[in-house]
């Protein structure tokens, strides 16, 4: 007999050599019917797994989050089976589960058409209805290679041949289809009910551009119809909000081939950029930061000393001049250490909070560039806090408080924290890491956050916190970071005089709230769908006249607004007022000041706010006061 422990704390005895499915069936037939996989001693396994010894067991169903990846992995096998049934001459290659779905790569002479994809999706539904049993098989490697060669699946044979000899090969069979896979999988194809094929793209075999191009079909799969519908709605909404599309429509910025990954900011986009910078500058000054400016182009000797040359050389832009190698800085930290080192620093000078809107360049692959979200030239709201070990907790708490205030001002209140602790390869002693990790954990908890652990994902020089925002349509964006560094002050010989009179190394906290301003603006464009709040909008008030004889008064209103720092636009053309209002609304200007005969006589304007038909009559002074009040909350 063996003892099996369950999540509710109960322990039950069973005959040895019982399968996980049989255990589920012994508990209840309904559980066995819903069961997808088993978690045995913390590891996901097929329900057919034989249990020989005492263990901890969870039976998982589609309601458990762990099963979502199983559903997606099953869907990848189902798409491959469907494609092979419809197009027997194609070859299958790889098909993993990915975030939000799955894909499968196929070798096919002619491209898949939209009709082909629709046929494949329909056949997938047929395979689900068949409820084909999915079984795991152990094969000898060489026999598996020969088998796949014999059925014309040469890509699959190549993958298996690259596995070391003697390693067991696991194949999964469903219907007439068989595929190489580690598993686990659900017991049958009937568990994958809610999916949709999304698009076809090219992909090189093994990700190598020297190899042949394959066709990749992407799909999404979910545990329930509601989840699938919500995801498809989110994608539809995301397409409407795409910052690249809105950037063109609202005349904010553009990109072009001659400067890949570099932003051409237009007047309105640059207004948003400068307003955000002004806002952050006010915040950091209030929180005791100094602001510095460091060179963009720096000799490689500094990057060698800091360690960046060895680790990031491929991502840096370098040039030769006067027998020297210079590099555009990819980050600001080594330069900030140089400022810290000017003059003798005492423990009384700490913490020293040094900020910079630093212009950085990173040689991102052209295929990875994506609008404002991934660029080669970027400015970070970067800062480094030089402090003593005993100040780490307080500085982290202060930073978390500042970060929360900033995110709230931009409308983000759902903030998640990820804590990345020590990696296997790291600098510093375990004692130092213990102190650092405990200080960060204590600070996060003091700041009122809970965190999820990313084991082993810290940098080699210290643990880090990542702050993740959830936007209006449920997407998550990692923006803020706080990273502890024991190594750079050592490498660049930064020190301060402690109270005891001895020299000590400061701890360096790398921190950013927005990350890159470019990316954050991209996120904001999509968060607001282009409808910026008044304080941030590039044009705060648009003025529109009903008839041309009101133009002089309209210009008088515009001058008063401009003189008081209000960003304005005006249309005093002969066009109809409804056309003017529609055009300004399409530009997503938050307030439109309509001027008619009565407004001129009373020295008023009639305000229409974006997205409403409500009207409000204000004097020029009242309008200015209203805008100033909004601005002063943030600027």
Swiss-Prot record:
Sorted UniProt keywords: Aminoacyl-tRNA synthetase, ATP-binding, Cytoplasm, Ligase, Metal-binding, Nucleotide-binding, Protein biosynthesis, RNA-binding, tRNA-binding, Zinc
Entry cofactors: Zn(2+)
GO cellular component: cytoplasm
Region spans: Catalytic: 242-533
Family in the record: Belongs to the class-II aminoacyl-tRNA synthetase family.
Residues that coordinate or bind Zn(2+): 333, 384, 510
GO BP terms, alphabetized: threonyl-tRNA aminoacylation
Any GO molecular function: ATP binding
Organism annotation: Rickettsia felis (strain ATCC VR-1525 / URRWXCal2)
Gene: thrS
Binding partners and assembly: Homodimer.
Free-text function comment from the UniProt entry: Catalyzes the attachment of threonine to tRNA(Thr) in a two-step reaction: L-threonine is first activated by ATP to form Thr-AMP and then transferred to the acceptor end of tRNA(Thr). Also edits incorrectly charged L-seryl-tRNA(Thr).
Domain of life: Bacteria
Protein name (record): Threonine--tRNA ligase
InterPro entries: aa-tRNA-synt_IIb, aa-tRNA-synth_II, aa-tRNA-synth_II/BPL/LPL, Anticodon-bd, Anticodon-bd_dom_sf, Beta-grasp_dom_sf, TGS, TGS-like
Catalytic reaction(s) noted: tRNA(Thr) + L-threonine + ATP = L-threonyl-tRNA(Thr) + AMP + diphosphate + H(+)
A Pfam short name: tRNA_SAD
Annotated localization: Cytoplasm
PANTHER family in UniProt: THREONINE--TRNA LIGASE, CHLOROPLASTIC_MITOCHONDRIAL 2, THREONINE-TRNA LIGASE
């Amino acid at each position: 007999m063996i003892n099996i422990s369950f999540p509710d704390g109960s322990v039950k005895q069973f005959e040895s050599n019982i399968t996980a499915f049989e255990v589920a069936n012994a508990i209840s037939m309904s559980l066995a019917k819903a069961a997808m996989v088993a978690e045995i001693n913390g590891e996901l396994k097929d329900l057919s797994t034989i249990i020989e010894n005492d263990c901890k067991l969870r039976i998982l169903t589609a309601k458990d989050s762990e099963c979502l990846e199983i559903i997606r992995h099953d869907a990848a096998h189902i798409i491959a089976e469907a494609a092979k049934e419809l197009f027997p001459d194609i070859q299958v290659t790889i098909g993993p589960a990915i975030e939000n779905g799955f894909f499968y790569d196929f070798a096919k002479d002619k491209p898949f058409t939209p009709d082909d994809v629709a046929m494949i999706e329909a056949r997938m539904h047929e395979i689900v209805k068949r409820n084909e049993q999915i079984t795991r098989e152990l094969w000898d490697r060489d026999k598996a290679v020969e088998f796949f060669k014999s059925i014309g699946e040469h890509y699959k044979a190549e993958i298996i041949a690259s596995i070391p000899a003697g390693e067991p090969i696991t194949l999964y069979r469903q219907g007439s289809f068989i595929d190489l896979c580690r598993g686990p999988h659900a017991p049958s194809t009937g568990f994958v009910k809610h999916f949709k094929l999304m698009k076809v793209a090219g992909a090189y075999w093994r990700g190598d551009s020297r190899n042949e191009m394959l066709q990749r079909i992407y799909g999404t799969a979910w545990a329930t119809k509601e989840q699938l519908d919500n995801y498809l709605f989110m994608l539809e909404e995301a397409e409407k909000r795409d910052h690249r599309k809105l950037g063109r429509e609202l005349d904010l910025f553009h990109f072009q081939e001659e400067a890949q990954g570099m932003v051409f900011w237009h007047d309105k986009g640059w207004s948003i950029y400068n307003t955000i910078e002004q806002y952050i500058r006010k915040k950091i000054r209030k929180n005791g930061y100094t602001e510095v400016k460091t060179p963009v182009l720096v000799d490689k000797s500094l990057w060698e000393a800091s360690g960046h040359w060895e680790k990031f050389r491929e991502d840096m832009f370098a040039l030769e001049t006067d027998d020297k190698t210079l590099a555009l800085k990819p980050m600001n930290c080594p330069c900030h250490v140089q400022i810290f080192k000017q003059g003798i620093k005492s423990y009384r000078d700490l913490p020293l909070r040094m900020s910079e809107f630093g212009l950085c360049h990173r040689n991102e692959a052209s295929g990875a560039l994506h609008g404002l979200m991934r660029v080669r030239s970027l400015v970070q709201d970067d800062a480094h806090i030089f402090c003593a070990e005993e100040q780490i907790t307080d500085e982290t708490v202060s930073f978390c408080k500042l970060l929360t205030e900033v995110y709230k001002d931009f409308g983000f209140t759902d903030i998640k924290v990820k804590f990345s602790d020590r990696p296997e390869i790291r600098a510093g002693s375990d004692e130092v890491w213990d102190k650092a990790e405990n200080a960060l954990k204590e600070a996060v908890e003091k700041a009122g956050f809970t965190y999820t652990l990313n084991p082993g994902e810290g940098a080699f020089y210290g643990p880090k916190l990542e702050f993740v925002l959830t936007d209006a349509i449920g997407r998550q964006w990692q923006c803020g970071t706080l990273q502890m560094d024991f190594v750079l002050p050592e490498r660049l010989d930064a020190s301060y005089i402690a109270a005891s009179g001895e020299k000590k190394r400061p701890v360096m906290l790398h921190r950013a709230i927005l990350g890159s301003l470019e990316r954050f603006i991209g996120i904001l464009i999509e968060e607001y769908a282009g409808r910026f709040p008044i304080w941030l909008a590039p044009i705060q008030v648009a003025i529109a006249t009903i008839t041309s004889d009101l133009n002089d008064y309209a210009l008088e209103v515009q001058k008063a607004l401009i003189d008081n720092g209000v960003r304005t636009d005006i249309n005093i053309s002969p066009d109809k007022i409804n056309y003017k209002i529609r055009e300004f609304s399409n530009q997503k200007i938050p307030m439109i000041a309509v001027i008619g005969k009565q407004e001129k006589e009373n020295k008023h304007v009639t305000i229409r706010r974006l997205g409403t038909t409500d009207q409000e009559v204000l004097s020029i002074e009242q309008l200015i006061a209203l805008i100033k009040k909004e601005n002063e909350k943030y600027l």
